């Protein structure tokens, strides 16, 4: 008998957001080690690279003029301005990977996430939380990539972002990286089992087909030799 349930080939579109310093990238990097069907979309930004960030790996770094040109040409699935810089998700490649059955992760700011929610309601939205605000501030300071003024702006912005949690499907507190990764992995597994993501169920088929398939199973069972000791 064929499988009772056939899942869609289409991959999941997953949006992961959270305050700067909550550990989004660390969770995604660990997730890539345990799942081989994930593609992480590379965002575009008009900000300058930080530390050892590389173009085409961490971000596509564009000038403000280049970014605004791409906005006019409708090149982005979403875009937003954050701390004086543009961030956006290029449309290119995302559909291709989804159609190939790969799950696509977008690590984007909340403004952009909410724009995607308006357009694509099947998207899975996950919000990553720091264990405490004091811990978040400590992480931002220890990164040593921003001035104290920028850190204060990020910290204040974090409070605003946390107020948007009810608009997400899931929230994961990153107080332990391994546990946080397992929770996100479990979310993706559960999403694949949702009824509305199933392509075909026998209950949607003709009654005769169900009956014939069940008879085939019974016939195979009767013809099998089972020795009980």
Predicted regions, residues:
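Post-Walker A alpha-helix
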Residues: 27-28
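NTP-dependent small-molecule kinase module
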Residues: 2-7, 160-229
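ATP-dependent small-molecule kinase phosphotransfer cores
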Residues: 43-104, 111
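Conserved phosphate-donor/acceptor-positioning beta-strand/loop module used by diverse small-molecule
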Residues: 104-109, 118-143, 173-176
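Conserved lysine of the Walker
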Residues: 24
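P-loop (Walker A) phosphate-binding loop of NTP-binding proteins
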Residues: 17-19
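Post-Walker A helix-loop "phosphate-sensing" segment adjacent to the P-loop in P-loop NTPases
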Residues: 32-41
């Amino acid at each position: 008998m064929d499988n009772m349930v056939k899942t869609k080939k289409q991959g999941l579109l997953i949006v992961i957001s959270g305050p700067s310093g909550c550990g989004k990238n660390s969770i995604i990097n660990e997730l890539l080690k345990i799942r081989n069907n994930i593609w992480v979309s590379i965002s575009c930004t008009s900000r300058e690279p930080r530390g050892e960030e590389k173009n085409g790996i961490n971000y596509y770094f564009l000038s403000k003029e280049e970014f605004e040109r791409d906005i006019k040409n409708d090149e982005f699935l979403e875009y937003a301005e954050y701390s004086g810089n543009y961030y956006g998700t290029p449309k290119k490649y995302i559909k291709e990977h989804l159609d190939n059955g790969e799950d696509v992760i977008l690590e984007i700011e909340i403004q952009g996430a909410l724009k995607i929610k308006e357009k694509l309601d099947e998207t899975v939205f996950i919000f990553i939380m720091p264990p405490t605000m004091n811990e978040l501030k400590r992480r931002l300071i220890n990164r040593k990539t921003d001035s104290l003024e920028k850190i204060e702006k990020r910290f204040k912005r974090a409070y605003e972002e946390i107020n948007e949690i009810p608009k997400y499907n899931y929230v994961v507190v990153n107080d332990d990286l391994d546990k946080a990764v397992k929770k996100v992995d479990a979310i993706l597994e559960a999403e694949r089992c949702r009824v509305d993501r199933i392509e075909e169920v026998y209950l949607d088929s003709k009654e005769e087909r169900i009956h014939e398939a069940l008879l085939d199973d019974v016939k195979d069972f009767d013809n099998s030799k089972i020795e009980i000791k």
